[in-house]
Amino acid sequence: MMFQDSVAFEDVAVSFTQEEWALLDPSQKNLYRDVMQETFKNLTSVGKTWKVQNIEDEYKNPRRNLSLMREKLCESKESHHCGESFNQIADDMLNRKTLPGITPCESSVCGEVGTGHSSLNTHIRADTGHKSSEYQEYGENPYRNKECKKAFSYLDSFQSHDKACTKEKPYDGKECTETFISHSCIQRHRVMHSGDGPYKCKFCGKAFYFLNLCLIHERIHTGVKPYKCKQCGKAFTRSTTLPVHERTHTGVNADECKECGNAFSFPSEIRRHKRSHTGEKPYECKQCGKVFISFSSIQYHKMTHTGEKPYECKQCGKAFRCGSHLQKHGRTHTGEKPYECRQCGKAFRCTSDLQRHEKTHTEDKPYGCKQCGKGFRCASQLQIHERTHSGEKPHECKECGKVFKYFSSLRIHERTHTGEKPHECKQCGKAFRYFSSLHIHERTHTGDKPYECKVCGKAFTCSSSIRYHERTHTGEKPYECKHCGKAFISNYIRYHERTHTGEKPYQCKQCGKAFIRASSCREHERTHTINR
């Protein structure tokens, strides 16, 4: 039985020349695999069946793959003469239907039709077993490059390779510095900049060139995670993310940076990392002119202009600019720490925290400050440190105008305005602005006091307390008041200086009385509840 208004295979297939394929990042190749797997599933669901393909192997020769898949689709139908049409999938015909006015070519063997002689001839050879003179001379690859002697099955593959061989990349992106060897490559790439792809996400409006990529993306919003790790049970939205995660268990890394020795799972990751050494930032924001190392970074940055935060926590309603931040935030509710240090067993919420921690064991600090020579474990730490020399504070609070060196400091400060306390004690329900405060508070329940004074043996719940205490033995008072010269052991000087400035930032919500310290305000507020 034939399906009415069924799509042609080319409408759902994704194709690249072998040379375009060679230029793709592993992450882009992984996307291809995802798309083809989804295509197989979708076509199977409408009655088309064939043997399960090993896409991992077959995507190495995608163009020949599509011919095989067409044949398998034909074989799966009841009649051998299925009426399936064959379009030659040229570079700029990807994901498009056959253009009107093109004369079809009919196979004399089985009666099937195709729009191009190349696709028809390929099909006839499949029917008759006929091999052309070029085929007999060079085997399956009749087109041979004079420079490198590499041979190709298809003319367009040969032509694309010829450009790659001569380093010719005539197509460049106006939005960024990327260059491409074919018109189709730049068209697909421009969708990322323009956001005008034909398939849009129902939830956030993000545009995609292919339907299947859009469907995979929507899983971020729906929470569907069909791919599960057998070792730890963690689930993922995409099949390609799973093997990357599995490397956290095996410790396998594919590439190592020659500059600093850091290891990476994919060549695309190491290419991006190398820019931290060279200083190359090919992606520029049109609104503010700021430049970035990676495309994902500029996409994330653009949301600071639009204020867009499409990823919302179902538990507390907090919104985020990217899915990974929501995922990381979710672990503050669950307490999950899936990434464990092999040397000391300490667990972390995300891989970046683990990687940062692991460097404390090696003491490797490849990034040196040019002004003072201080070494750092990663480029981002060096960048933040350099602000101590320049005095730069790029992160400003929209509520009060206060500026900060670090974005994380701004985020924490904003909680003083919103009153948000996302970290709650499971034992008594008390909530805290900072996770570190919760961690210290939990020791009041457990009785754990890991910091002991070497002079008198007194123990403390947090490191700052023991630092202040030790100064009672040494007599050190590093904090001096600018107004009266009085010195202090701790940063209590902040409260003291308010006695000179008259600043009282903590106000009672009931009567409006203001206080220098938050603890004084809280104590006062209790007088209202007692008087009731």
UniProtKB/Swiss-Prot annotation:
UniProt-listed GO biological process terms: regulation of transcription by RNA polymerase II
Keyword tags: DNA-binding, Metal-binding, Nucleus, Repeat, Transcription, Transcription regulation, Zinc, Zinc-finger
Zinc finger (C2H2-type): 103-130, 143-165, 171-193, 199-221, 227-249, 255-277, 283-305, 311-333, 339-361, 367-389, 395-417, 423-445, 451-473, 479-500, 506-528
GO cellular component: nucleus
Domain of life: Eukaryota
SMART domains given in the database record: KRAB, ZnF_C2H2
Gene Ontology terms for molecular function: DNA-binding transcription factor activity, RNA polymerase II-specific; RNA polymerase II transcription regulatory region sequence-specific DNA binding; zinc ion binding
Cell compartment(s), UniProt: Nucleus
Start and end residues of each KRAB domain: 7-78
PANTHER family, per the entry: RIKEN CDNA 6720489N17 GENE-RELATED (PTHR23234:SF10), ZNF44 PROTEIN (PTHR23234)
Family of this protein: Belongs to the krueppel C2H2-type zinc-finger protein family.
Role this protein plays: May be involved in transcriptional regulation.
Name assigned to this protein: Zinc finger protein 20
Organism, scientific name: Homo sapiens
